[in-house]
Amino acid sequence: MRAITTHTGSWDVDPFCPCARNRKERYQMNSCLDAFSTTFDAFTPMLNFHEQQDAQTEWRSCRVNSQTVAPLDASSPLSYSSFAGKCSQEAVDDTKTGLGLAMGLYDGYYLIRDTAYKSLLDRAKISGSALPKLSRTVLAAVLNECLHLHSAEALLLLREGKISAVHSGDAVDYSVLPISELLGTLKTKLDARFPGNIFLAGYTDHAITSASWQLPAQREDLLGTYAKLLAANGKATMAGRLTPGVRFITSDTGVASAKVSALLTGDQHPIHIGSCVAVDHRHQSKIADFESAMDQLFAQFGDAVSKLQALMEVHLDYPVNAMTRVCKKLSMPKKAADEAIAMFEMAYGDNPATAHDVFMAMQEIPYILKTEHTPESKLLIVEENMARAMSLRWSEYDRARAVS
């Protein structure tokens, strides 16, 4: 897949025209491509981007058995003319070298984005690791045989000339929560409850959107007790540089709920310490539900810090073994985890440590991945998984026996 250049400023052309290009400097917006991603260094451009994207997004209802999947590869009879007016030649070529599938609807064929693959299988009610190994012709035939068995409603997300998701059409199973409205609601709530908040960074690709803020004015309220404990345990330098923050994540392709998590910023990489607010895209959820949930952010942030603080009381006799087992339990990327474990072992040797020491040492993992240019979406998943370490029963991992 081609590398996609990202954008961090304002747009000088419509970024939502098929594969539109920003002609300023070196930036190139190939927003129709599956591998597209972009970053933002200010909130307003990010909000503007999603407002325009939401305005040009189509949500279309149809019956599952009315969908027909077609192969799109070198041997496919479909060509650019089959998608006339819906996408660019570049988007067609991108799909041919990627997922290699298209869908026929009442008004013609649409490309299927890779983000739609899982939800398409869900509508067909099939799964299996062998499916991606099939030729596109065989895979399309299998999908059609299964799709045509089901008369339930589906809700298609059409964006940038491709089908980006094939959700259930039942409002109990999937509720649309426009990203621009979530962002606007979040900013209003942050300004009201956390005045002085500072936007740090934003990220968007076709699967996930995230944004993070720092909350410097609430440092004493949120981290005061924790910072004092750090200082009392010889970690005054760490205590002095940490500042509370929050990260927002959402997805309209089925990857994530609309959630806000607690962060500690100021270190080499933000430390994710747990989810505070989460509203699923289910059960007829509305933006108002997210707005109401945000009222609990301050209290939930305090609970997350208390959990982190409690790790300082969990003493480990075999911290290197414990770290190794916890990383395995949480499915941390092995190469980065091994490197972080080796660094921790060099620092602590055979000496005892606390679960807090190990948790902080694990923060090297996302930093290592970041330096290796790991995609942002994968980093977010790693950080969320790592935060689960705060709720583990550490005694189960603190064993003398070497890890196999």
Predicted feature residues:
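Extreme N-terminal basic, low-complexity initiation segments
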Residues: 4-5
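Feature for intrinsically disordered/low-complexity regulatory segments and propeptides
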Residues: 22, 26-185, 194
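Short, Lys/Arg-enriched N-terminal segments with co-localized hydrophobic residues
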Residues: 9-28
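Intrinsic disorder/low-complexity polar-acidic segments
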Residues: 167, 174-404
